[in-house]
Amino acid sequence: GDIGIFSFEQSKAMTSGEGGIITTNNKHYYQDLVALINLGRGPDNKKNKKIIGWNFRMSEFHAAVLMAQLNRFPSQLEEKVKNIALFESLLDEMNGIDYIHQDKRISRSGGFLFTLKYNSRFFDLIPLSIFAKALRAEGVLVRTRDLSYNSPEVVNYLRKENIKPYCPNADIVVKEVLLTIPHHVFLGNVDDIHNIFNAILKVKNNIKELKGYSIASKVKSKLLNIISI
């Protein structure tokens, strides 16, 4: 492609809290993009008659924070890649938990989110949400996801346009299969990676107790629904 986009939102590998960067080797796109973020003024600071633009210029403070991180990024990425490889090798020995395998054509990964694939058949049909809650109780930073069309800003737009999205396979994945671990977890040491794996193993080995908790939670939820009615 002609344009690359990188976010610097607080959860990213490099962060300044918010903002991002756009990269391009296309001179025409470069001139228009600068005008878009600089109140319509291009690289030569002259007004672009086609583009009004906004004030999206990055502050010097944010740039300084990012420059410091840029120097550390190569060594941090190397550490993450090494720890992710270790974690994958441990998961390969466990039934019921898989991960997104990297395409062999990819020569280098940013390691932003590590995605787990949960198979409840190996965990006595415990729901994904209960499994995730158990892992968090063991100190593992996992989270479930949601579909973007369920977010308030998208829901309002879809309602206005009378669009009813229907993505059943995606719904199943986010509700029953997919868990993510943030990238900064893999900046730890070898012991940290083994601790994460051991936490998953502990939850699996105590599945009967977790099953009882899951049933109790469902009963409680039904009772609360009856009371609210």
Report each predicted region and the residues it spans.
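Acidic/polar loop patches that form or flank catalytic/metal-binding clefts of enzymes
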Residues: 30-31, 99-100, 125-126, 140-145
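Conserved PLP cofactor-binding pocket of PLP-dependent enzymes
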Residues: 41-46, 86-91, 130-179, 208-222
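Terminal low-complexity tails and localization/encapsulation signals of metabolic enzymes
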Residues: 198, 220-224, 229
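Ser/Thr/Pro-rich, low-complexity mucin-like regions
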Residues: 190-207
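Conserved PLP-binding active-site segment of the aspartate aminotransferase-like
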Residues: 103-105, 112-123, 143-148, 152-162, ...
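Short amphipathic alpha-helices in soluble, non-transmembrane regions
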Residues: 33, 126-138, 196-200
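Extended hydrophobic/aromatic segments used for targeting, binding, or gating
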Residues: 107, 112, 121, 128-130, ...
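Active-site region of PLP-dependent enzymes
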Residues: 1-113
